[in-house]
């Protein structure tokens, strides 16, 4: 189930991923890996403000932010050469949990959801939806990669088209939504790893408008009260 090393390295480096997507004609946000590259693209009218910056190899959206002026962008990129610059995507922020079968090497499950709210880089409120165009876009994009098992894909929907942002070759932090909607990756893993059999196609086999809400809370009670409630449950 572990990703191929070359694929894992590609997914970890967001700028290399961008170059790979462009090379393979997969729609993605315009990205620049340095201030000189951005300056050339900006002067050529290929990218405009506001823009979005984030670490080239970061995770959890640490350091990611919007920037509105060339002066501020130059300043932050001079301070941190590990940043990349992307065009600001203003469309819908989406996520897809994907399972690539380890026997057939084909995607057998795609669970798509809209992000309603995010925290520390991950979605904590999402709602499921289906779109055959999204399923087709994901399947076509995956032809360029070598994956095994669970994936987490970040996408945008803007101006009537889907764009691929990032791929994490692992379970996504919000995979619980897919599982709760009946998209059972552990069962797929069991079939592949234990039974050595390929999974059948489950793409789109879930209900729309299933909502997941994750939240933190604080409970302050006496120990005997908690124990009593647990016994009741």
Regions found by a protein language model. Give the residues of each.
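A short, flexible beta-alpha/helix-coil linker loop
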Residues: 57-59, 117-119, 170-173
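Phosphate-binding site of ATP-dependent enzymes
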Residues: 65-146, 156-157, 161-163
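ATP-dependent carboxylate activation and anion-phosphoryl transfer catalytic cores
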Residues: 130-233
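Active-site nucleotide/adenylate-binding loops and adjacent lid/helix of ATP-dependent enzymes
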Residues: 8-90, 102-104, 132-135
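Short, acidic/small-residue loops that bind anionic groups at enzyme active sites
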Residues: 1-9
């Amino acid at each position: 189930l572990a990703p191929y090393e070359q694929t894992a390295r590609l997914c970890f480096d967001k700028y290399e991923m961008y170059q790979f997507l462009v090379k393979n004609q997969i729609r993605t946000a315009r990205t620049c890996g340095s201030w000189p590259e951005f300056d050339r693209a900006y002067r050529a009218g290929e990218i405009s403000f506001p823009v979005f910056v984030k670490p080239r190899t970061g995770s959890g959206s640490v350091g990611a932010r919007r920037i509105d002026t060339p002066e501020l962008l130059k300043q932050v990129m001079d301070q941190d050469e590990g940043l990349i610059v992307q065009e600001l995507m203003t469309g819908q922020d989406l996520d897809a949990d994907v399972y690539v079968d380890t026997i057939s090497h084909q995607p057998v499950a795609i669970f798509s959801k809209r992000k309603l709210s995010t925290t520390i880089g991950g979605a904590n409120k999402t709602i499921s939806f289906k779109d055959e165009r999204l399923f087709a876009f994901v399947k076509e994009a995956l032809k360029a990669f070598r994956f095994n098992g669970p994936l987490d894909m970040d996408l945008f929907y803007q101006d009537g088209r889907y764009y691929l942002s990032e791929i994490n070759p692992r379970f996504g932090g919000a995979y619980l939504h897919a599982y709760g909607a009946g998209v059972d990756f552990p069962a797929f893993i069991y079939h592949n790893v234990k039974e050595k059999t390929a999974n059948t196609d489950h793409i789109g086999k879930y209900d729309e408008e299933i909502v997941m809400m994750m939240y933190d809370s604080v409970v302050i009670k006496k120990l005997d009260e908690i124990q009593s409630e647990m016994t009741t449950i």
